[in-house]
UniProtKB/Swiss-Prot annotation:
The name this protein goes by in its record: CinA-like protein
SUPFAM superfamilies: CinA-like, Molybdenum cofactor biosynthesis proteins
Record organism: Shewanella sp. (strain MR-7)
Coiled coil: none
Domain of life: Bacteria
Classification via InterPro entries: CinA, CinA-like_C, CinA_C, Competence-induced_CinA, MoaB/Mog-like_dom_sf, MoaB/Mog_dom
Record family assignment: Belongs to the CinA family.
Length: 425
């Protein structure tokens, strides 16, 4: 079986100044193609460290994807380090120099002399085309491994992996030994609670379970390695879903917002949103997905009591009698949001995100959520543990999404979430 590794370069990645989303995307994409990464290494912009890691990992891997360090500045050292690791010189690749000159001409810019560095490759390198940028990809054989060099710019990396890297490894290696993955997204239960339900199950050989906590969700990953295990994966996944019941909110989706987006897109139904404590988070997460304009009619942030009254038509007496964070208020918010454009559904939130503003009766983490439909309104008050402001908002958004998801599936809209908090009418 091919052994695949990844080397991520850059001081900003190593020091935590930026989150390495390239590595996460690459690993996920490879898994979608049935290919598993065995190791990932991060190294800074130091020539001797890069040389050492290229030499050491090339003794163990069959293919190594190297990401970053192909730019025109002094801290871009990947090509130089690869040449030194193999005992070669850097030579100008005339084809890539012409590409650079043409690229700058097309963009009506004068090419800086520093960009010529991007055409300098190790002597034995095979150029890998990058039609969407100026960084030249290349691959070099060192010891047992092919090292495949890619730019750090995310969309350039993605293009090169899809168009160059995956076809190369499929042609070069026997990839019969496959890995498959199913992902179940849950809310409202902690890892230990989920594990207590799953771990008594007898799993077939080749199938393993992993957990990833990323509040407000916990993702359950079901890995299947080998043809027999892959064939059994749907049955095992179905059994786990049955055991977990209402805790599972999506399958093979990264977020609950993505699940809602897909369901609304396919249903032709419309949604409006009125947000107070979530401050536009529900709307923003849906707008992240292309095509959301086909179902999302409007998103209103009605933070003040005055805006709740004047924009959504909340009765001032409701606010006086029950307060902004209450079932009656949030129900009127949802009804008002739905009525504006006669949407099929409307979600509304009003709560105390903290860190201040709570009372003994309504502490920080108290959130009222409502879903208005053409036939009526569902509502609930959740009392979240005292956590960060962002987490209270994201948990509230997740519960709102799940209420809508359950309505779309004609399931019970109001359910108990163990770890999110207790509920009251």
């Amino acid at each position: 079986m091919m052994k695949l590794e990844m080397i991520c370069t850059g001081e900003e990645v190593l020091s935590g100044q930026i989150v390495d989303t390239n590595a996460a995307w690459f690993a996920s994409t490879m898994m979608e193609h049935g290919i598993e990464i065995q190791r990932r290494v991060t190294v800074g912009d130091r020539l001797e460290d890069l040389i050492a890691v290229f030499q050491e990992r090339s003794l163990h891997a069959d293919v190594i994807l190297v990401n970053g360090g192909l730019g025109p500045t002094s801290d871009d050292m990947s090509a130089e380090a690869m040449a030194k690791a193999k005992g070669e010189s850097l030579v100008e690749n005339r084809e890539w120099r012409q590409h650079l000159e043409d690229w700058f001409t097309r963009n009506n810019r004068e090419m800086p002399v520093s960009n010529l560095k991007q055409a300098m490759l190790p002597e034995s390198a095979v150029m890998v085309d990058n039609p969407v940028g100026t960084a030249c990809g290349f691959r070099v054989k060192l010891n047992r491994a092919w090292l495949f060099f890619t730019p750090g710019v995310p969309f350039e990396l993605k293009h090169m992996v899809k168009e160059q890297f995956i076809p190369f490894i499929r042609e070069e290696f026997d990839l019969d030994a496959k890995v498959a993955l199913k992902k179940l997204l849950t809310i409202g239960h902690g890892e230990s609670s989920l594990a207590d339900k799953i771990e008594p199950l007898e799993l077939p050989e080749g199938i393993t379970i992993g957990y990833r906590s990323s509040m407000p969700h916990i993702e359950i990953k079901i890995f299947a390695r080998g043809e027999k295990a892959i064939a059994l994966l749907p049955r095992v996944t179905g059994h786990i879903k049955m055991v977990l019941g209402t805790a599972v909110v999506a399958e093979d989706k990264a977020t609950l917002a993505e699940e809602i987006h897909a369901k609304l897109l396919n249903s032709g139904l419309t949604l409006s949103v009125a947000e107070s404590c979530t401050g536009g988070m529900i709307t923003s997460q849906l707008v992240d997905f292309p095509g959301s304009s086909s179902y999302l009619q409007h998103g209103l942030v009605t933070y003040s009591n005055e805006s709740k009254v004047r924009v959504l038509g909340v009765n001032p007496a409701t606010l006086d009698d029950h307060g902004a964070v209450s079932i009656p208020t949030v129900e009127e918010m949802a009804k008002g949001a739905r009525a504006i454009l006669d949407s099929d559904f409307a979600l509304a939130t009003s709560g105390i995100a903290g860190p201040d503003g709570g009372t003994e009766e309504k502490p920080v983490g108290t959130v009222a959520i409502a879903l208005a439909t053409r036939s009526g309104v569902y509502s609930q008050m959740i009392k979240l543990p005292r956590r960060s402001r962002d987490l209270v908002r994201s948990l509230s958004a997740a519960v709102a999404y799940d209420m809508l998801r359950r309505e779309l599936l004609t399931e019970a809209v109001i359910v108990d979430y163990q770890s999110i908090g207790r509920f009251s009418k």
